[in-house]
Amino acid sequence: MERSNRKTRIGRVVSNKMDKTIVVAVETKVRHPLYGKIMNRTTKFKAHDENNAANINDKVSIMETRPLSKQKRWRLVEVVEKAK
């Protein structure tokens, strides 16, 4: 399987308390089916961070990978923007 076919997401790190694991919140805009209002939906992904490089509030890019644990199916690709 080529890596280019894997899903990628960009989000903010909301937790890095675990060893080699970060929690990334990804926001998507969704239109309400009945009323048409555009809402923000937040989904949290647990991602593998081998070098513990990401900190809270960093903007990061994650990529889909094989299952690494019960809940981890994503890995950190790069830190796009460091927190201020």
From Swiss-Prot:
InterPro entries: NA-bd_OB-fold, Ribosomal_uS17, Ribosomal_uS17_bact/chlr. GO terms for molecular function: rRNA binding; structural constituent of ribosome. The lineage of its organism: Bacteria, Bacillati, Bacillota, Clostridia, Eubacteriales. Belongs to the universal ribosomal protein uS17 family. Part of the 30S ribosomal subunit. GO terms for biological process: translation. One of the primary rRNA binding proteins, it binds specifically to the 5'-end of 16S ribosomal RNA. Pfam families: Ribosomal_S17. The keyword ATP-binding does not apply. Keywords: Ribonucleoprotein, Ribosomal protein, RNA-binding, rRNA-binding. GO terms for cellular component: cytosolic small ribosomal subunit. This is Small ribosomal subunit protein uS17. NCBIfam families: PRK05610.1, uS17_bact. The keyword Ribonucleoprotein applies. It comes from the Bacteria.
